[in-house]
Swiss-Prot record:
Keyword Membrane: yes
Keyword Endoplasmic reticulum carried by entry: yes
GO biological processes: protein quality control for misfolded or incompletely synthesized proteins; rescue of stalled ribosome
Intramembrane segments: 106-126
Cytoplasmic membrane side: 1-105, 127-183
Similarity comment: family membership: Belongs to the SAYSD1 family.
Protein name, as recorded: SAYSvFN domain-containing protein 1
Assembly and binders: Associates (via N-terminus) with ribosomes.
Main location class: endoplasmic reticulum
Keywords attached to this entry: Cytoplasmic vesicle, Endoplasmic reticulum, Membrane
Function, as annotated: Ufmylation 'reader' component of a translocation-associated quality control pathway, a mechanism that takes place when a ribosome has stalled during translation, and which is required to degrade clogged substrates. Specifically recognizes and binds ufmylated ribosomes when a ribosome has stalled, promoting the transport of stalled nascent chain via the TRAPP complex to lysosomes for degradation.
Compartment(s): Endoplasmic reticulum membrane; Cytoplasmic vesicle membrane
């Protein structure tokens, strides 16, 4: 497993070196700055590295956005998953922190919350925005994507009846045979 990981990282590094601009632009940094930048990147967690490192896409990738990078497949693996699956190159927009739409939505919500707090309507804005996000977060069954698993089928793979739960028929029978409330 670690050998395959090392091969994948080597292939990724080769692809990254091929996509780098000429060394003339990197010569402007002093060796101390390069060492400090490398130490910062090594110490940063994975999600932070994506935002600290920004590499422009090579001209060939801009001309053909459908280009994909293929990882090397180990020769000795027959029953394991193949490593020759296509991995799309990340676009420069994917790496930009400011174009993350979720971040912008949260930032807008915080700014509006601050405004309404100053106007002394902060609690009303907070409660109304909670109802709005609950509405947005729920969706009807017609919006389900083709082939998407339901939560029930994820936790109960065969969709078998669970002992102690009511079936739809049992529930209907219980509701119809029950006397009306208050009579």
């Amino acid at each position: 497993m670690e050998q395959r990981l090392a091969e994948f990282r080597a292939a990724r590094k080769r692809a990254g070196l091929a996509a780098q601009p000429p060394a003339a632009s990197q010569g402007a940094q002093t060796p101390g700055e390069k060492a400090e930048a490398a130490a910062t990147l090594k110490a940063a967690p994975g999600w932070l590295k994506r935002f600290l490192v920004w590499k422009p896409r090579p001209a060939s990738a801009r001309a053909q956005p459908g280009l994909v990078q293929e990882a090397a497949q180990p020769q000795g693996s027959t029953s394991e998953t193949p490593w020759n699956t296509a991995i799309p190159l990340p676009s420069c927009w994917d790496q930009s922190f400011l174009t993350n739409i979720t971040f912008l939505k949260v930032l807008l919500w915080l700014v509006l919350l601050g405004l309404f707090v100053e106007l002394e309507f902060g609690l009303a804005y907070f409660v109304l925005s909670l109802f709005y996000w609950m509405y947005v977060g729920t969706r009807g069954p017609e919006e389900k994507k083709e082939g998407e698993k339901s939560a029930y089928s994820v936790f109960n793979p065969g969709c078998e009846a669970i002992q102690g739960t009511l079936t739809a028929e049992q529930l209907e029978r219980e509701l119809q045979l029950r006397p009306l409330a208050g009579r």
